[in-house]
């Protein structure tokens, strides 16, 4: 279903961030002062990727929640004359109505509330201007090993072509 696909997308992002974390720890090196410093490449990858992932995560929650994020009854509604109907029609396959509404309320707080909007803005810019962060990463990243791999590949490919033509 589309919900499973969207949740799987969230899982992919989670596992990517966990991989950055693991690499940052496992490839940490001691600096000149004897302090353990996390791997720079993993940190740069995470701090450049997450601000772009967060808006997508928020969007996925909005898509999954759909109209359930808009029509949220209050606690007072559950104590009023509509309570039996709310309990009946708002229950989920695995959740009682109040639990389901609480889950939707949490999703609403994370997506549609003022808090959710501020949080997205915060996540987008916490590490700095995203364009400058990418520019900085480009300028400090050691691209030479990858250029060398491409040169070696092209050299091998050209030698194969030369053998075929001979």
Stretch-by-stretch model annotation:
Residues 24-35, 83:
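Short acidic (Asp/Glu) and glycine-rich catalytic loops that position anionic groups and cofactors
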Residues 1-29:
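Extended amphipathic alpha-helical segments enriched in small hydrophobics
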């Amino acid at each position: 279903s589309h919900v499973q696909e969207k949740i799987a997308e969230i899982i992919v992002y989670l596992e990517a961030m966990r991989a950055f974390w693991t690499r940052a720890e496992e490839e940490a090196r001691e600096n000149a002062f004897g302090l353990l410093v996390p791997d720079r490449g993993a940190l740069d990858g995470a701090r450049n990727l997450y601000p772009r992932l967060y808006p997508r995560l928020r969007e996925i929650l909005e898509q999954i929640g759909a109209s359930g994020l808009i029509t949220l009854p209050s606690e007072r509604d559950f104590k009023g004359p509509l309570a039996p109907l709310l309990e009946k029609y708002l229950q989920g396959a695995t959740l009682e109505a109040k639990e389901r509404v609480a889950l939707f309320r949490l999703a609403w707080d994370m997506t549609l509330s003022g808090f959710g909007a501020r949080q997205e803005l915060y996540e987008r810019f916490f590490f700095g201007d995203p364009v400058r962060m990418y520019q900085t990463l480009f300028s400090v990243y050691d691209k030479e090993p990858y250029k060398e791999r491409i040169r070696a590949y092209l050299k091998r490919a050209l030698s194969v072509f030369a053998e075929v033509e001979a």
